[in-house]
Amino acid sequence: MIKRILHFGNPGYLSLKDRQLAIDLPHLKTLDEKDGKKSVPIEDIGIVVLDHPQITITHGCMEALLENNAAIIVCDKSHHPAGLLLPMEGHKTQSEHYKHQLKASLPLKKQLWQQTAQAKILNQAAVLAGRGIDTENMLYWARSVRPDDPDNYEGRAAAFYWRYVFPLKLKFVRDRLGEPPNNLLNYGYAILRAITARALVSSGLLTTLGIHHHNKYNAYCLADDIMEPYRPYVDQLVLQIVDNGEDFTELSNSIKAQLLGIASVDVQFEKNRSPLMVGIQNTTASLAKCFAKETRKITYPLMRNVDGKRLVKYKAITEGLLDVAAEEEVPYQKASEDEKEYPF
């Protein structure tokens, strides 16, 4: 079951009662004292976003959330995620998984990054194709990626992608500190990063030790690696907001709610579809198997174009071939309304 993302953007008091997250929201109280009181089962929660300086959360509440492998995000005064709290233990055989990860060979890491870069480029190509942009060069770059991507095809593809993905009238330049809608991308990526880090912990892996990213100041190198092919799903949400003509100069509650919905976006794997939060768990589980030498293929989703067809067959990513053809539709179960984000 997909876990829920709870966003708190107003003053509130969060505590633990009967294995439930007890929520006291003074701003909702009117004539009835019960109006401002809600509760959510701890076991249903995946991520809690604290986005107001007047939120109080008890020690017992945090302990219960972490015990159930939930992540806690704290936002700064500009409403951007500033910190992430994760469980210390997320898997019953965590020590064994750590050993496998630490012993992973350099050739394996290079091959895993090759697959990661290919998946990212192909998903970026799908987004561009959906906007009527020719993607022949993107497909060529994806096909040309070698282990560890020494030719930097991932970088070339990114430069082309950001040049054309947004309407030209915006004169968009991707820069973390740049003009909107960079702010929307930053927020969406931060949520995606938290989802990925949580999934890695639940798979018994160290978020610090990446397969490609290795900045000594970055505690989430592996999360930054694994989230790469999932970034285009955030991009699509941002594009929808821009195309709908919404005011994206500031992170409004409406926009934040839409971006928090990234967890329930459908992602397509070889034989099934699933909500993104579940999909990332499948990806991190396959990564753990790679480190354990049970397989050499990491499981990533490939996006479909707006016409429902894929640019490439799923096996292209692991076989190094780009056979441009659509696959047959496969069944999936969409997330229910109760499984989607739960903003407060």
What residue spans do the PLM features occupy?
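Active-site helix-to-loop segments that bind/position phosphate- or nucleotide-bearing substrates
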Residues: I2-I5, P11-G12, D18-A22, P26-H27, ...
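Glycine/small-residue-rich interface belts in oligomeric ring/scaffold proteins
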Residues: L31, K38-T93
